[in-house]
Amino acid sequence: MRVLGLNGWPRDFHDASAALLVDGRIAAFAEEERFTRKKHGYNTAPVQAAAFCLAQAGLTVDDLDAVAFGWDLPAMYRERLGGWPHSDSEALDILLPRDVFPRRTDPPLHFVQHHLAHAASAYYFSGEDRGAVLIVDGQGEEECVTLAHAEGGKITVLDTVPGAWSLGFFYEHVSEYTGLGGDNPGKLMGLAAHGTTVDETLSAFAFDSDGYRLNLIDPQARDPEDWDEYSVTERAWFAHLERIYRLPPNEFVRRYDPAKGRVVRDTRRDPYEYRDLAATAQAALERAVFGLADSVLARTGERTLFVAGGVGLNATMNGKLLTRSTVDKMFVPPVASDIGVSLGAAAAVAVELGDRIAPMGDTAAWGPEFSPDQVRAALDRTGLAYREPANLEREVAALIASGKVVGWAQGRGEVGPRALGQRSLLGSAHSPTMRDHINLRVKDREWWRPFAPSMLRSVSDQVLEVDADFPYMIMTTKVRAAYAERLPSVVHEDWSTRPQTVTEASNPRYHRMLTELGDLVGDPVCLNTSFNDRGEPIVSSPADALLTFSRLPIDALAVGPYLVTKDLRH
């Protein structure tokens, strides 16, 4: 079967994406932001991502057996907005406009319940036959948590938690309160390691063996003017935090920055002052999720756990879940957030139509790829000098070993929020100054933000305390004492790191580069962060990579088989 999964709609949506399954295998998968260059793909159908997916597979809409959408939009409109105003044909015209997707007939359109799409993205691509499912996010159609049992290709819902008790919204509201922004929960997670937990209940949570209760908000509270409870929970949490926390909300202001020569958006206080609140919020989140996980594992009798939903991107929480005594195996897809519901919806419909889903494997590289001719044409348009080294991997390794920052744009682009050796900025993991250099000079961001390492899987058991595959940078683990001092730029305050383990099968060129680096510096480990400027999506095309390379103090760019260098001093 050929099933195109979609996420993204013109009203109040984020993370627009498209995924194409052909006979149960991922043929293409991409985020709309990578094409539009507008981060998070807000309030748009995934037109460009869908066009890429079909082009990648050499298909048209007429070749599709089904289109799947990762929300039950008709139910949401009927419940919240007075009725669903579109026929399936009209909805398809919004999602796949005919001027871009000409067709003789419309394929069947399936609206998949949101948490089922999340569950499918984790379970069907895990390679496991059975396990317990835990979905935690901001909110689906109504629920913010789903507990389910996956077995024999079927997903059975056991329990849900209503949206007013959302852990995802709670974490976003705390992030907003600190001045980090509600759409930057990853920053709050990073800040938490610098703080001290004060009271993990926050005078609002009650934790028990089944998860949590929230004494702050009526679980049945509804927002009559919107289709989720974000505003209801925001008002309640901000009022509560102002009562119990020593600092007021960190307000955003506009001020003139002499260094940048323009008016910028900033906060009245340094968000670092809120580090104890960040640590407390992280502890509360973990306590609640651990209870939910233990509950669904006990109720299903399983020891394999599948996790998805936006909260599933919390790598610190995931790393601790992995080591709980109740968990033997755990799978969190690299697209745990709403990016992944296009893939999950496609999988749910494909299974319904009789397909078996192939495991995801150790890669997220399903985006666009560019030929050497296309890369060379982009280079020629810039007028930059470049060359084609006989051993690109060795030269890049030597640059990293000498303290340079290298842009790396190779193969098919990743999908998801993490750069995984396809569109990455690479630096020395051994340099004591590299973290500050990339944070402050290259990426123009907070000094306390951590960086993650890529390392060969063959040495990860020596570097990390947990011997496991970490292909997606979606779990943290502790670094062994001997390596914590050797790899200062990729080890966080609490001696944790969010590793990517690399095998030859998963990424041959990146594996060769890390091998060469190991020969030069002793450890096949490098700092790996996303290749993007502040506030922008990860680069996709050679033109994106070259533009970002020209704007940022990056020393070299390896794009396809070519190497571009410039003389920038740290």
UniProtKB/Swiss-Prot annotation:
Q: Give an example GO biological process.
A: kanamycin biosynthetic process
Question: Keywords for this entry?
Answer: Antibiotic biosynthesis, ATP-binding, Hydrolase, Iron, Ligase, Metal-binding, Nucleotide-binding
Q: Active site: which residues? A: 14 (proton acceptor)
Q: Which residues bind tobramycin?
A: 12, 172, 228
What positions does the entry give for Fe cation binding? Answer: 114, 118, 137, 338
User: Which of this chain's residues are annotated to bind carbamoyl phosphate?
Assistant: 418-419, 498, 528-530
Indicate which residues the UniProt annotation says bind carbamoyl adenylate.
139, 168, 172, 310, 314
Query: Which catalysed reactions does the entry list for this protein?
Result: tobramycin + carbamoyl phosphate + ATP + H2O = nebramycin 5' + AMP + phosphate + diphosphate + H(+); kanamycin A + carbamoyl phosphate + ATP + H2O = 6''-O-carbamoylkanamycin A + AMP + phosphate + diphosphate + H(+); carbamoyl phosphate + ATP + H2O = carbamoyl adenylate + phosphate + diphosphate; tobramycin + carbamoyl adenylate = nebramycin 5' + AMP + H(+)
Q: In which pathway does it act?
A: Antibiotic biosynthesis; kanamycin biosynthesis; Antibiotic biosynthesis; tobramycin biosynthesis
Q: Where is this region: YrdC-like?
A: 367-570
Q: Look up the domain of life of the source.
A: Bacteria
User: For binding ATP, which residues are annotated in this chain's numbering?
Assistant: 39, 418, 449
Give the enzyme's EC designation. 6.1.2.2
Task: Give the cofactor note text.
Answer: Binds 1 Fe(2+) ion per subunit.
Effects seen without this gene: Cells lacking this gene accumulate kanamycin.
Which intervals of the chain are annotated as region Kae1-like?
Answer: 1-354
Domain remarks: Consists of two major domains: the N-terminal domain (Kae1-like) is involved in the transfer of carbamoyl from O-carbamoyladenylate to tobramycin or kanamycin; the C-terminal domain (YrdC-like) is involved in the hydrolysis of carbamoyl phosphate and its subsequent adenylation by ATP.
UniProt miscellaneous comment:
It seems that TobZ plays a solely passive role in the adenylation reaction: all functional groups appear to be provided by the substrates themselves, representing an extreme form of substrate-assisted catalysis. The role of the iron in catalysis remains unclear.
Q: What does this protein do?
A: TobZ is involved in the biosynthesis of the 2-deoxystreptamine-containing aminoglycoside antibiotics such as nebramycin 5 and 6-O-carbamoylkanamycin. Catalyzes the hydrolysis of carbamoyl phosphate and its subsequent adenylation by ATP to yield O-carbamoyladenylate. Then it catalyzes the transfer of the carbamoyl moiety from O-carbamoyladenylate to the tobramycin 6-hydroxy group to yield nebramycin 5'. It catalyzes the same reaction with kanamycin A. These reactions are considerably slower in the presence of deoxy-ATP.
Tell me the protein family, please: Belongs to the NodU/CmcH family.
Q: Output this protein's name.
A: nebramycin 5' synthase
